[in-house]
């Protein structure tokens, strides 16, 4: 399959050889949205605010006395800061991962666009918190499994191979 014709390049043949996987990739926590839908449980990224060059991202939480805090994000381990009781979403902060690009609600449109661009593969990650909402569940969340099954079916409808990482 040649993507660019010889006429377009002055006689030089360009393009990808047959079997080349042309596609794209996404990361569930940045892209999916639907952060509290379909039985999905919370992940640390759900309590991480937006940021910029001048304002670092922060993690928001409540201490044991009920006071709200927003501290700079240093790393992604699950340990709360000293005196912390639980992570929480606080008013006045933007949590960009809550919506991402709203793939959760628009995956059919997005996958159709991927097909129009000629994608043959779509690399995606799976949000563990959509499959095991509490992190220690004995059984997976069926609604979460169905969401990913529907994505795979939609990819196959357009001849796109899902590649899960």
Give the location of each predicted region:
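Non-catalytic accessory regions flanking glycosidase/transglycosidase catalytic cores in CAZymes
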Residues: 2-164
